[in-house]
């Protein structure tokens, strides 16, 4: 698979991940803790797709590395909020199946 196909495939996968997160939190949570942590998870998780898309439009190698660095930080934050939500029993792990975002 060439680089362009991989980029398009990863764009589609990160977008699907963002859509799943939006659907998971489409119904307003009943308690404040879930609402706050869920909002953080929603924000960082959906920005993954946007930041990856932006990295595909990089104008130079340095620009690409910079954009991927932001993406890496957002991915780590998304994982953090996912762990917090799951370990606090605020969401079920099934909502966010990590297999959907594996490289």
Regions found by a protein language model. Give the residues of each.
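Amphipathic alpha-helical assembly/interaction segments
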Residues: 1-103
